[in-house]
Structures are given as C-alpha cells and as structure tokens.
A protein has these predicted regions:
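A broad, structure-centric signal for solvent-exposed, well-ordered loop/edge residues
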Residues: 43, 66-68, 73, 83
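Short, well-ordered amphipathic alpha-helical segments that serve as non-catalytic structural scaffolds
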Residues: 54-65, 90-97
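Fold-independent oxyanion-binding glycine-rich loops
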Residues: 39-41, 52, 62-64, 77-80
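N-terminal amphipathic/basic leader segments beginning at the initiator methionine
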Residues: 1-50
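Alpha-helical support elements that line or immediately flank enzyme active sites
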Residues: 75-97
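Short coil/turn connectors at secondary-structure junctions
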Residues: 30-33, 54-56, 68-73
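Catalytic cores of large soluble enzymes that bind and process phosphate-bearing ligands
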Residues: 26-29, 47, 51, 68, ...
Length: 97
C-alpha cells in the first residue's frame, strides 16, 4: 500500500471544494462535532454502510442519496448516533440534506 501524502490546504486544496467544521453542541466536551464538505458540482461518490439491521435515519437517507453514484455534499456529525428516531429522524435527515 502506498504511503499517504498530505496536501497543503487539505481537502479544500481541490478546486471547487469547500469544507467547514463547527461546534454544534452535540458533544458535551464542546469540541467540533459537525462537518460539511461541499462540491460546487456533483461528483462521483461511493460509500460503505453498516450491515446492522438497525440503521439510523442518516444512514438510510445517505443510502438513498448516493444510489446513483453521485454526491455534492457530505454532512457528518459525531457524538450522537441518531438511531431509532423513527419517521421524525428520517424527516430531519432529509431536511438537513
């Protein structure tokens, strides 16, 4: 396997890519817990999802969005699994995207 080569500027060094990480108050530690990566144009995308029978709303909605192999943004949170939120969780995940 090839060594990883870090690029100055990180992911935003790629033309058309914007990214941000913020403190949304999900984690009690007060650390950054929400990220957004945005492409100015739809891009080829692939993902690996859990095989667990109980999938959180964000996983289900993400599977819907990436079905055609394209994406324009990634929203990622940490500190809360968002599992077993029912129909409201699906609604909330769709609203975010």
């Amino acid at each position: 396997m090839a060594d990883v080569q870090w690029i100055d500027g990180g992911i935003t060094a790629v033309p058309g890519i914007l990214a941000a990480g913020v403190i949304a108050g999900i984690k009690p530690s007060g650390k950054k817990d929400l990220a957004l990566i945005y492409s100015s144009a739809p891009a080829r995308a692939a993902a690996v999802f859990t095989t667990n029978q109980v999938k959180g709303a964000p996983v289900l909605v993400s599977q819907e969005h990436i079905r055609d192999g394209r994406a324009q943004a990634i929203v990622a949170s940490s500190g809360c699994s968002n599992v077993c939120t029912g129909e409201q969780g699906i609604k909330d995940a769709r609203e975010i995207t």
